[in-house]
Amino acid sequence: DYGKAQENVTVAGVPHTFAWGGGHGAIPKYHAHGIFLVIDVTAYYPSLQKQFKIGYRVMDHPENFEFIHDSNIEFKRKGDKKARQPFKIMDNAISGQMKQPQSALYDPICINGQLLLLDLVEHLEPYCKLVQNNTDGIIVKLADYDRDFEKIDDVVWEWEQRTGMKMDFDTFMGDIYQKDVNNYFLVDR
């Protein structure tokens, strides 16, 4: 059954599971102190959907989806959380329906996102330590911020150019305590 299949592999020294719901990897029971980058793709699956026209073949009016998605991104950039909320919910709901076989919007998208993030991780591997890869973003630890940040930024920029996606960067200095991919917290210095 395709929906239940999963593949367990090691990527950048981190155990990963690739399955119907996304790609997930994390160093288990990990604690470290240092400088980390939290790198997330902006509205990843809806952005993939628009960039590569995934699902358009089953939509009567894809321009309606584009309006919802573009409004979500516009309000995010303006920092207007209240105005953004309904568009964000609709944007993500549309992408979520795309992996449901009983949905009129069925057109699986998740594998596309998994492969593109895997590509990013492989290009970043020489310049940082992968801590976590979670469906729409990654956390990496920098050994030397002054030496490595610009190279990482260049790799991410090149990835954005190839994929049409946009990334959000947050630099974090402190400690990470991680049980697994969905159970972690960051503590500021």
Predicted segments, located by residue:
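Common nucleic-acid-contacting/processivity interface regions adjacent to the catalytic cores
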Residues: 1-37, 41-50, 85-115, 119-122, ...
